[in-house]
């Protein structure tokens, strides 16, 4: 009966899942009341902004017929990105001369540029799925196979991005129902749990693979909120970009060193990164702009499909993962900018057609 009721519900959207996951993080954490209230407010404000973005799409009145979507070109572009990503994955494994999945300590020897380029495989496959009519069962089979390939690099995030983005794309193409997306979500959680247990086993560490990570991440956020509120003055997000040019440490490493922790990187949560850089009030413009953009892009992607839906699927995944890790990688930031460019292109094309 519960599954039947689930199928009769409307579409589950990003802002729904964002608030739900944020609440889960709060439930499994032990942080100060003030920081908890701000964290919850951030997710609720994102929810409201996302809804406003959807409304804005209707107010502007995008005509998808004017966009002249060529799904074949989008498909070919996706295949090209997959090839580049596959070459990068192979090169990275050759570079490190080990398999980080089974030896997590070897992950620090991966080539940062190969690793970054390997993410194009995820983007390419998302675009291919969004631009083609491949059978649903084949897509899921290929996705599992590709997940095994990607997880060799030892990053759970990449596997999650692949699984979540494909699930979102199939769901918004109406190829899977509410009931099926629930089952798919459970499968993704089981895979995450398995990878987390494998990582702890390889490191010889004991503990709950899920709640211990949530508790640690939220405690870091709590420390930033109470002791480093606005202290970084934009340096965290500066590091997210310029660390790839060798000008500074990565954003998460900067946070770790500030807290006196060395040889590891630390995830500050998406809220913690913003507050650490710009102060508590910065969550209003940050989540306001992010929510409006993603709400608008969601409606555009759902109507147009192709590369629009492919990129939205990737942003869907990174936004949810960003609750813990923050949006602090240059390639991920570029995906958001690419999505923004697609939105601007659709708006300008409408204006020019008038």
From Swiss-Prot:
One of its GO terms (cellular component) is plasma membrane. This is Uncharacterized protein MJ0419. The keyword Cell membrane applies. It is a multi-pass membrane protein. It is found in: Cell membrane. Keywords: Cell membrane, Membrane, Transmembrane, Transmembrane helix. It comes from Methanocaldococcus jannaschii (strain ATCC 43067 / DSM 2661 / JAL-1 / JCM 10045 / NBRC 100440) (Methanococcus jannaschii). It holds the Pfam family O_anti_polymase. InterPro entries: O_anti_polymase (IPR002760). The chain crosses the membrane at residues 9-29, 31-51, 76-96, 109-129, 144-164, 185-205, 278-298, 306-326, 327-347. The keyword Glycoprotein does not apply.
